[in-house]
Design a protein with these regions (language model features):
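N-terminally biased helix-coil "hinge/interface" segments that flank
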Residues: 1-320
Length: 320
């Protein structure tokens, strides 16, 4: 049997005859599995993977369906499928600093990177030696701890692979097209630093965190005081982004498109108000923001972050 895009089952024979019915079958299968494991009839389900987070609503024990059918590349297929919100946020989201005036802002994704801890497990000494060399340099650069790689090749430090302006432009184009892959610090590395994940090379994650921690703002001050503080900053950013994303998807599923759009655009004043409410900040005017259903967290990083995400959204976490 094969799961259809709407969460129902179909035979293998029918799937071969009408493969279009399997659009979004993977996420739909996750939702059906979540419903089976949790026995919940109503829930918001968020599945955090390496590249993306998929969010959908369970009602009556089944996934809520999209009224307009699945969309592929902006085109309506008219095929019944799960009403799902997908955002570029996951365990492999690229974490880096962005200069904002004289300060630094931590960005997560939407670009994906191979985590440093995993790259060191795969390729060994070349990764560790390059990270240590960058840490030994007197001055930090934004490219410290960033590598690029082609399929089947050992990653090279970004600065070594981009010797001149023309080569740099070519490498950046190759990263966008997928011909090359970025290796850099990610939330997966942060969880290794904090001892909440142990699948791969913790030393590489620690070195990457140290390189990010010593990046300088416009006043010449280090971004944070230690690798552990940097890792906690990244984990906190993942929690906040996940909470905002889940709440936005819940609003969208309920038809509250203006509220969903406000959360998707940080420059909208309402976004700031909701963020303050989610953070529990005191103010003269109080706004409560959260979920009316339990939050089911799926994916490798769910156990490390979704307890705090649910707390932020004033709901119960369920981690099957």
């Amino acid at each position: 049997m094969v799961v259809r895009g709407d969460g129902a089952l179909m035979s293998e024979r029918l799937a071969r005859t009408r493969p279009i019915e399997t659009i979004l079958s993977g996420p739909a299968a996750s939702l059906v599995g979540a419903a089976t494991l949790t026995k919940l009839h109503e829930a918001v389900v968020s599945d955090i993977g390496g590249t993306t987070t998929d969010i959908a609503v369970l009602e009556g024990g089944r996934p809520r369906l999209s009224p307009s059918g699945a969309r592929v590349g902006g085109h309506r297929t008219l095929v019944e499928a799960v009403d799902m919100e997908t955002v570029g946020l996951g365990g492999d989201s690229w974490a880096r600093w962005r200069r904002d005036g004289t300060g630094l802002v931590l960005d997560l994704g939407p670009e994906r990177a191979l985590p440093l801890c995993r790259a060191a497990t795969m390729f060994g000494a070349p990764i560790l030696d390059a990270l240590k060399a960058s840490l030994a340099a007197l001055r930090p650069t934004p490219e410290d701890g960033v590598f690029v790689m082609e399929a089947g090749e050992t990653p090279k430090p970004f600065t070594d692979a981009t010797g001149d302006r023309r080569t740099r432009a070519a490498v950046l184009r190759a990263l966008v097209s997928g011909q090359m892959r970025r290796v850099a610090f990610t939330p997966t590395d942060a969880l290794h630093v904090l001892g909440q994940h142990s699948a791969w090379h913790r030393e590489a994650a620690m070195l990457g965190a140290a390189l990010l921690a010593r990046q300088r703002d416009g006043h010449g001050q280090a971004a944070v005081g230690s690798p552990e503080a940097l890792a906690e900053r990244v984990r906190t950013a993942l929690v906040e982004r996940s909470a905002t994303t889940v709440l936005s998807a819940a609003f969208a599923a309920d038809g509250a498109t203006e509220a969903a759009a406000a959360l998707a655009h940080p420059d909208v004043p309402f976004h700031t108000t909701l963020r303050a409410a989610m953070a529990g900040q005191r103010a003269a005017g109080v706004l409560t923001a959260g979920l009316g259903y339990p939050l089911v967290g799926l994916g490798a990083a769910a156990g490390a972050v979704y307890g705090d995400v649910a707390k932020t959204l004033n709901t119960e976490p369920v981690l099957p």
